[in-house]
Amino acid sequence: MAGVLAGECSYSESGVSSHSRNSHEKQEEVSRWYFGRKEIEENSPSRLDGIDLKKETYLRKSYCTFLQDLGMRLKVPQVTIATAIIFCHRFFFRQSHAKNDRRTIATVCMFLAGKVEETPRPLKDVIFVSYEIINKKDPGASQKIKQKEVYEQQKELILNGEKIVLSTLGFDLNVYHPYKPLVEAIKKFKVAQNALAQVAWNFVNDGLRTSLCLQFKPHHIAAGAIFLAAKFLKVKLPSDGEKVWWQEFDVTPRQLEDVSNQMLELYEQNRVPASQGSEVESSVGGGSAQRPGSRNAVSTDEHVGSRQTSSVRSTHEQSNSDNHGGSSKGVLNQNNENGGGEAANVSVDNKEEIERETKESSLHLESHPAHKDNVREAPHNSRPLVEGPGKDNSEREGGELQDDGAVHKSRNVDVGDALISQSPKDLKLLRDKVKAKREKAKKLLGERTRKKDLMDEDDLIERELEDVQLAVEDEKTKERKVQSRPKAENSDLMGTEHGEILDVKGEVKNTEEGEMVNNNVSPMMHSRKRKMGSPPEKQSEGKRRHNSENGEESHKTSRGSSHHGDREHRRHSQENNHS
């Protein structure tokens, strides 16, 4: 780094305090840190040293993640972290990654940002925390940095780096952020202020990992963040007469589109093929201090329709693959070149995908209520969702079943950063499992239907029994009306004693008094009638009526017999007289 310091003296000599400049020079000072995207990507010093765009993009995300972690451990505000990140972006626009250790420069930028934003942290604390993060794979790092020799070496490295950063930036430490214009604009909208502000704030924080701050002014970035947040939340931003909302930011539609597209590109870049191996192992995301486990899922009608979707996954520990730091690196460059990889990546979900999954979930719960107890909401954090080829991907966390169309499609799943396609054999197994689950669900529905049918049959039987009871009462009423008239059918009851009745087979059955016998009634009806038997008064009345009927029949029979004997006697006497 001493060579870098010597080579940058021209920047130090040209640095002049800002109070001696006039307003025109101040305007030039602000505008000199904004460049075209082509210039940033094609003409950077790193490109001249053989580092391609993809590698530089990865390195940019890496030091952003490192600064986010460092700032959170030092407990500095998010604005201070953002200032440190912008210092780094500006430094590496003029310096090459091949000649400077990005984490040493990032540590210097955090130390400077604390002083610029009036939230300073002692140099000793900055060095201790930085050393522990960089050497996190070394369990004895926290003890090594307490050694005087190691600490003095790191202190000298940071102080020399501070001179290099100041000279490279031309001692221009004025930085403006999108946070203030964003909050002021949302206050005017008066539409879902809390949710809109939080999501837009997250977009601004994620945008720090890109080169947007070198291309667009802060209020342009704020407009792009609000635009994406409104699309994500499906909120219609108000217009003041003929003036639309984005005109508040003095931004053109072209600029708004560019900012939005570059923010969305960041999420697409999180999917990096494993074939890049040692060069770029994975995409390292810069987490947000203001984003406590929130899950960003962004979609816009204009820009996101054709975007590739990816699940939220955690980044992996990085190995020592980056060797572009030069021979002059200090102890900070010995272990774990990619130490900032603890933060989680937040990727974009397509709006149509989210709506489809929600619809499938609701349909499944309506048709299978038994599964409702097992449903869990998707966690709002960045836990890794890694699926293997042999895993049943048709069964989701809430017990949801994908439709046949979704199961038949070949899907890419994340295993680390590699993209693995499922084989036809695995898909066949998935189809069989889905089919078995559906058959099981149908059986459950069938059992519920049968139970309902049984209940309906019970109701019908009960109604029939009520009708039988009414019929019995009608028969009793008719019987009372014809008590005085003789009936030929009553001859079957002759010869019975004490209410004993002969059935069809000639067997004697003891029946309850006052109970009517019906050979066609089933045993269930008999039991029903016993439960619903006549009260004692009716039973005694029936007994008296039965006895009287038997007496009348006996009397009529005896009287008929006596009359018949008299007639025979008279006829016999007359025949004797004639003879």
Swiss-Prot record:
Designated name of the protein: Cyclin-T1-5
Region (Disordered): 1-27, 271-419, 474-579
Protein family per UniProt: Belongs to the cyclin family. Cyclin T subfamily.
SUPFAM superfamilies documented for this protein: Cyclin-like (SSF47954)
Claim: Cell membrane is one of the keywords in the record: no
Residue ranges, compositional bias (Polar residues): 11-20, 306-334
Chain positions found as Phosphoserine: 423
Domain of life: Eukaryota
Gene symbol of the encoding locus: CYCT1-5
Any Pfam family: CycT2-like_C
Species in which this protein is naturally found: Arabidopsis thaliana
UniProt keyword ATP-binding present: no
GO molecular function: cyclin-dependent protein serine/threonine kinase regulator activity
Record field: compositional bias (Basic and acidic residues): 349-380, 389-414, 474-512, 538-556, 563-579
